[in-house]
Amino acid sequence: MRPGVEVTELASGLRVASELRPDVHGVALGAWVRVGSRDEAAPVAGVSHLLEHLLFRGTERHDAMAIAEAFDRFGSDLQAATSREETDLHARVLSEHVPLALDIMGSMVARPGFHDVEAEREVVLEELALYDDTPDDLVHDVLGELLFPAQAIGRPIAGRADTVGALDEEALRAHHARHYAGDQVVVAAAGPLEHERLVALVEAAFDGLAPAPTHARPAAVAAAGRRAFVGRDLEQTHIAVGGCGIGRTDDRRFALAVLDQILGGGASSRLWQEIREQRGLVYSVYSYVTYFQETGQVGLALGTRSENLAEALGVAGTEIHDLAQGRFRDGEVQRAKDNLKARLLLTMDSTVARMSRLGRHLVSDVPLMSDTEVARRIDGVTEADVRDLAAELFASGALCVAGIGPDEAAFDAALGAFREPVGGAA
């Protein structure tokens, strides 16, 4: 447990967590629900995201305009997000606004009014259309379905137009009743707010939530070596490469963070330097890590013109292979560790970051470590740890590749250039 953090479990099973920061004006508040797109049946894909939207349409105590006007008066934006495994609401308000802010957030989570379903469904359909016009985002959805085929964890978080268009109030109410239960909710706060006061406010605001049976998630089954191409009349081809990663409580996550930083996490990373700075082949290139309950995803993404595609992917394949072989450059492992530790401390200057870490870790059952312990774990990562993880996660034939662009022949040629150093049938 981190110093200064207190956690209380209410009779409903709801957990209240806080970190006292008396030296700031604002209190960061968040409500986290253990439900996301991974928990949806195929016919209602997108229901978690639509429900998140609908929470803003009003509750039994606060209509939509009252919610909007209150947070405008607070000088705050009430935000929400849906991921594959969680849904959250969050805001940052002054101390005097905490009671009303929590009352509104509690009412949204526990007693939504399910108003204006048709209108909000149209908003989400417009969001999906916008997303479909953004190929550098859309390519990750194509990759997800390659890596986790025919599984909820691989489907787009927001669903698709056909399933979202069929969602009605009955489906939304059923999803809320099944998943918005006390023991699936965490309320977190960071700032000048005493824990006992927060607990009392949450008990009043989130009343009506009761414990419910926990719904087990089927274990994800990752595929390997698959490819997909979507033809679009674009100037660039957008590429996403991905493979199966590790779960969010795996002790190797610290080594994976170092590996990700070395490969494509910053301005001195291999992908950025070799593909963009040295060769000028891309505007954007990066690696990424995503954690789920028992598994995860690792990968990289870039966009470039067809004539540059084979060279760019060939360089990426070479860098992945070199890391898996333990060919490190002078100082890069230590530099990556220094970066991670510095970013940890800089991020923790933010009450929003502290609140988010509390809520996210508790709702997903990740141990709450002190900043000192996290830094110690990062310091303990060795070159061998990074090499072994790279060799495992980027093993021959393990990676799936998705592309969106104008020229499938150029895509296939680039896959050949990528496969040559990496090996396998990616």
PLM regions: where:
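Residues that act as N-cap/strand-start positions at coil-to-secondary-structure junctions
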Residues: M1-R2, A224
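Residue-level marker for the onset of beta-strands and adjacent loop->beta junctions
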Residues: P3-G4, V27
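Charge-rich, well-structured scaffold segments of protease-associated domains
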Residues: V5, E9, A17-L20, A64-A220, ...
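A short helix-to-beta-strand connector/capping loop
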Residues: L14, A224-G225
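Catalytic cores of enzymes that engage adenine nucleotides and/or redox cofactors via long glycine-rich
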Residues: V221-A224, E274
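Short Ser/Thr-interspersed hydrophobic loop/turn segments at strand-loop and sheet-helix junctions
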Residues: A267
